[in-house]
Amino acid sequence: MLPATSNLESTELFEIPEDDRKLMRKLGASFFLFGLINNVLYVIILSAALDLVPSSTPKGIIAFCNIAPALVAKVGWPYVLKGRIRYVKRIFGCCILSSLGMLVVALFDSLFARLIGIGLASFSSGLGELTFLQLSTTYAPPSVAGHGLGYFASGTGAAGLAGAFLWWEVRGLGVRVGVGLSSVLPFIIPATYFFLLPSSSTFLYTSIPPSGYESPNVQGSTLPYTPLAATEEELGEEEGSFRAGPRKNVSLTFNDKVRLVRPLLTRYMLPLFFVYLFEYTINQGVAPTLLYPVPSPDRYWLLSKIIHTIRDYYPLWQLIYQTTVFLSRSSISIGIPPLPPNLLPLPSVLQGFILLLLAFESSIGFYADDAEGLSIITVFALISLEGICGGLAYVNAFYRINQEHPDPSSAHNMERAKQEKEFKIGSIGFADSSGILFASLLAVPTELALCKAQTRRGKMLCKEL
């Protein structure tokens, strides 16, 4: 046994053969694609909101239908279904639902049909995110599992940029063709699963070091780590079914799940909930009111090249936000150490301050009305920090729970330990979605109140949109 040390994340002291590095690259690429494709349809739908519903219909209904079914999947699935996870069936089910949902949006013009299609794609996205987070826990040693999860988080961040860019490119084709073309994207996921993703059993004997161990004298050592799940044929009972046998009839009861989830509430769920509640209140309720006069080329040469009308401000804030979310969600995959466990609430605290500062800037303003350049730079910095906080909260919460050791009471039972780890990472997934849902309800009165505050001080830009 190699000695445990305090610096858990380093693998530099190990000489990893090229074959193992190639496996890690394939694992990272696979999980990056899972995160990218699973989330990109969500972004495409939000980006296409103006084109999907009549002008008289509140665009918030798109945001609601795009998040509520995903929340149902994240809340219900881990608690209701029992037994081992059949990842192949899950992945094919999500692929078909996503593609079908986008086809319904593309082929039908009625608002009701389009909302049904958006709901199908949303449910699939929520279940898909849950599935890939759980899939990451089936890899061992912990450094391998963390590698996959880090790249999955990076892929979800990239989806924001990719989705907005894709819709920008295809929106000229119209909803029927543009959204119809996006319905083929979900098929990348099963192709990745079968043709690119290494099996968890391929890491059974590798020289990749586990998180928590290091030795300057070990080079190319072969460590017998048994992954918590192997091939699909080796799995026990399926979700919702029970098979006979001393090893295969393990399933967590509802009381077991309640016991497991209690310590996760304050450690992971509340920080995730609040960071997303504040974040999406900013995006949907505050950012639309952060408007300034169009910069003059004489005073602000660079800004005048970017901002041509007051309608350009909101897309600019969203571009800044999506870019910084991608960078921060990629922090672990590019080698930045994760936050210490006791600092996991920090991003949500900072996000709350950012919300207050941006609301103050919108309603009262930090600077004089003719100093729009300073105001724009300040908002740029605050929204960049907003995206960083949101991305760090997401990737660090799921990374930390992915790396947790099994409960001592179940460590001797590999099957039970596997199911507990899958449930724990799946059970906290609803926290971010519920934060977004509550934010969508809070954003409408927030936007109206800030616009009224602006008009009271003579700033009428929000009335001109």
Regions found by a protein language model. Name each.
Residues M1-L41:
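Cytosolic juxtamembrane N-terminal segment immediately preceding the first transmembrane helix
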Residues A4-F14, S200-M269, F273:
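Long, low-complexity inter-transmembrane loops of multi-pass membrane transporters
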Residues M24, G28, L41-S47, V53-T57, ...:
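Membrane-interfacial loop- and helix-cap regions that link adjacent transmembrane helices
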Residues I44-S47, I118-P141, A164, L290, ...:
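Intracellular juxtamembrane helix-capping segments at the cytosolic ends
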Residues A63, P69, A140-Y193, Q318-T324, ...:
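Glycine-rich segments within core transmembrane alpha-helices of 12-TM secondary carriers
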Residues V72-D109:
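Conserved MFS/SLC helix-loop-helix module at the cytosolic interface between two early adjacent transmembrane helices
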Residues K82-C95, L173, I334-Q351:
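Cytoplasmic membrane-interface "Motif A"-like loop-to-helix N-cap segments
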Residues R86-I91, W168-P186, E420, P445-L465:
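A membrane-interface helix-boundary motif in multi-pass transporters
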